[in-house]
């Protein structure tokens, strides 16, 4: 991790980092406490080397603003977007539980009832996003969270894109984005996308839940895609 926990004060004057959770391709995630509302939140910090890239930082900020418009029980909520030490930070709902990826790694495959529950929950979340003009572009088990009570939430709209986006300088349809095993054919080819790409990815996830593997497997991620 790139932050010294012992040196931290309040981020944005109200969020106190508690402990490091995980990191992805663009950001690192921390659990924090909102000292104003006395509740746990997740803080997603853009990685330092990306924070120095003005285009990436601006895309990160714009996507946070777009995702903050989403209000749905199966979508991880975005509360705030701030800057900390020159890095963009998104304040999100903290979800206690584990990812579908963790569950599949442990159990290999799931029963039909749980699979249907996951599928309907994520489909409902995607319907809300698509109605608001956002496509997720990275529907995969690692971005599907399950609470101890069994609630399913779709997380990480980190590479989401507005369906009507014209920011050619900030995101390029000719660049393949997403996780190889769960990409739609149009994503593989770098073609323009709509909500059907997300539904294709969800279908691959549900196939894996039932079969214990994805339907298409190559020797490498590139071959799989």
Regions found by a protein language model. Give the residues of each.
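Activation segment of protein kinases
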Residues: 6, 52-55, 148-192, 219
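Protein kinase glycine-rich loop
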Residues: 17-24, 29
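Activation-segment/catalytic-loop signature of the eukaryotic protein kinase fold
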Residues: 81
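Conserved short submotifs of the Hanks-type protein kinase catalytic core
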Residues: 85-99, 103
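Activation segment signature within eukaryotic-like protein kinase domains
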Residues: 118-119
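Protein kinase catalytic-loop region centered on the HRD/HxD motif
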Residues: 122-134
